[in-house]
């Protein structure tokens, strides 16, 4: 018997819905990206330190949330990260910290900038180093010229290091920007001069944070990670693939980096918290008061 037009339409609609559902399920099964904090911890088997809320935009003012909107959900995420790092430093002091990611545009520079601000706001003396000598971004985030910085300090070892450091405009936070891009960043970062710079910075501040290139893009992060007290791997929700995050982790492990944990960036589930207050007062300081040194007289970069 011939089907009525209405019944034929119903069958066609049902078949279309089933096909669409099958496609959605297939895409979900094929999706290898990290989407939740527990995904991140399961994929890497290292502590998940914080989930950072998605920001409202990509302008410098919107990205540096700890400066412009510190009480927002995103700002709360950086305070949680700060607190968890303080507890990580109980057994071993944390003076030098490296921030990296598996691939580009996953939030490592934004994370480094906001974590540096969060630590400075808690009374720490912090130096933020833009060690990404390939695609630096800290000068844009803080609205500073990039005509002087780490690359110049590496190429002019006889000049005092404070000549290359500038003020951030925030109490407790100084910046060593990337400076002009060199033709051989990996060689410069692997030099003895860089080792001396790391030691001098660590002696002059409570915490020194290094923003480095992605681990799977260049060897730069691996060169520095071996010298650091701790390393954090940033993953971007819905962008970072599990297999690539695992490859980045394996490379860091191979150079014996001290991995403190991972951070999930742009987490769209982080819209707020049941309690805005965390036990930061009970968290131990990253360094003892005796650690603090007489800071250099910093000259703003013109």
Identify the meaning behind each predicted range.
Residues 1-9:
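Membrane-interface helix-start motif
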Residues 9-125, 131-151, 183-186, 192, ...:
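Short boundary/hinge segments that flank catalytic cores
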Residues 43-48, 226-233:
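Gly/Ser-rich helix-loop-strand patches that form or flank binding pockets
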Residues 85-88, 178-218, 225:
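Phosphate-binding/switch loop-helix module in NTP-utilizing enzymes
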Residues 96-98, 125-127, 173-175, 207-209:
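Residue-level preference for the first positions of well-ordered beta-strands
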Residues 152-181:
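Nucleotide-state-sensitive switch-loop elements of NTP-binding domains
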Residues 212-217, 228-246:
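Conserved Switch II/interswitch segment of TRAFAC-class P-loop GTPases
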